[in-house]
Design a protein with these regions (language model features):
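Fold-level signature of zinc-dependent metallopeptidase catalytic domains
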Residues: 3-7, 85-271
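N-terminal helix-rich structural modules
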Residues: 1-141
């Protein structure tokens, strides 16, 4: 399992690299322009020149306000231009909006194409790690997640992730949350967590998980707000996070997750 973890760390580092590009630009290119050591250290924490803990105030000379859409969209794109852009995949959480070099018109680029080198390398690492996984469910998840990174379809891997019951090591990886896209909230950013399950506390939480469907029914709100019934295969677990990468590591650390975000997965299986 130690050899497997080494591969997961490498895959997580690739999510770090991708998130830098999504948030500001490639890390090495960005850091070259910063000479002050304190600024360099704080930029590493914030994945860029904007203070995430202080209303995105720029702390490095030469930078203005952070683009609302980060680097998911062209900085000179207007909302009106986006609205007129006729492409069914423009609102996909797994596409970048770019400008065609020749026509200057908007076009979409799927994540697996825009970050081809990194996603392919991460997928290969996950496949290699799956061969070392002791838990069969975790091995299946890693294989499906590797495929998902290459095609931008995460449904099967999300289901496999929820099906895991006995794995002590967990790995959350890929484009997941949309908080960095403050323009429309469409685009999800890359991140990774490596976690070790706290078995004792997870067992204590099991009793609460089984009551969640009933608790939803008893919420003091109109029935109209309770029409969707989530899947009953819900889990509550406690983990020690041993590594954060990408979006979840920017400025503060994410300390709780409720995944997957896919509503269809939630209805079929839960979270």
């Amino acid at each position: 399992q130690k050899d497997m973890l080494k591969l997961l760390f490498k895959a997580a580092d690739l999510m770090n690299d991708i998130f830098w590009v999504e948030n500001v630009e490639a890390k090495d290119a960005f850091m070259l322009g910063i000479n002050n050591e304190k600024d360099r250290q704080y930029a590493l924490i914030n994945y860029g020149p904007w203070d995430e803990m202080n209303n995105l105030a720029p702390f490095i000379k030469g930078y203005g306000d952070k683009p609302a859409g980060a680097q998911f969209y062209p900085e000179n794109m207007t909302v009106e231009e986006f609205d007129k852009f006729e492409n069914p995949n423009k609102t996909s959480q797994y596409t970048l909006i770019r400008r065609n070099n020749k026509t200057r018109e908007l076009e979409i680029v799927w994540y697996h194409e825009g970050f081809k080198e990194k996603t392919k390398a991460a997928a290969e690492l996950l496949l290699e790690a799956s061969k070392l996984a002791e838990d069969p469910g975790f091995a299946t998840y890693l294989k499906l997640r590797a495929q998902a990174l290459l095609i931008d379809d995460y449904f099967a891997s999300d289901i496999a992730w929820l099906d895991m019951k006995n794995n002590l090591i967990d790995f959350v990886v890929g484009p997941i949350e949309n908080y960095t896209d403050k323009l429309f909230g469409y685009k999800t950013a890359h991140e990774a967590y490596i976690l070790i399950k706290d078995v004792e506390w997870s067992n204590k939480l099991t009793m609460y998980a089984k009551y969640l469907p009933q608790l939803q029914k008893e919420l003091p709100v109109d029935a109209a707000y309770k029409m969707e019934t989530p899947g009953s295969d819900v889990e509550l677990n406690a983990y020690d996070v041993i590594f954060y990468a990408g979006d979840c590591n920017m400025a503060g650390k994410t300390i709780a997750i409720n995944l997957p975000n896919d509503e269809q997965v939630q209805l079929e299986k839960g979270t």
